[in-house]
């Protein structure tokens, strides 16, 4: 029996990152983790910085880092519109580690609520990038 699929587009302000048929995808929404399958109820929600895990035909996985944005689900199609989207294999582990180190340093040396919020956001983004890199390497 053939897998039931739907169309998914992952786009950023710069370019289309992914377009194709998928069995499912997961993303971090504003209220928690979302798993989207064919036939999902229509949905429009904000997404947090993190990973889009795409399961294509035959269980093949792809991981994409997103810095935030929105996800829209309609019958037979879904779109992830990200502020920034980068395929796992295109992420730079050294840059992500350095961003993580700087963010931790900024949290320790913060001078107000705004500094802390910005540093915490940068730390979350760096950790998400490192997680996508890790999962992409495991897949190979």
UniProtKB/Swiss-Prot annotation:
Q: Which Pfam families match?
A: ATP-synt_DE (PF00401), ATP-synt_DE_N (PF02823)
The annotated topology with respect to the bilayer is: Peripheral membrane protein
Where it mainly occurs, coarsely classed, is: membrane
* SUPFAM superfamilies the record matches: Epsilon subunit of F1F0-ATP synthase C-terminal domain, Epsilon subunit of F1F0-ATP synthase N-terminal domain
* Function in brief: Produces ATP from ADP in the presence of a proton gradient across the membrane.
Family that this chain belongs to? Belongs to the ATPase epsilon chain family.
What this protein is called in its record is ATP synthase epsilon chain
The scientific name of the source species is Vibrio vulnificus (strain YJ016)
Organismal lineage: Bacteria, Pseudomonadati, Pseudomonadota, Gammaproteobacteria, Vibrionales
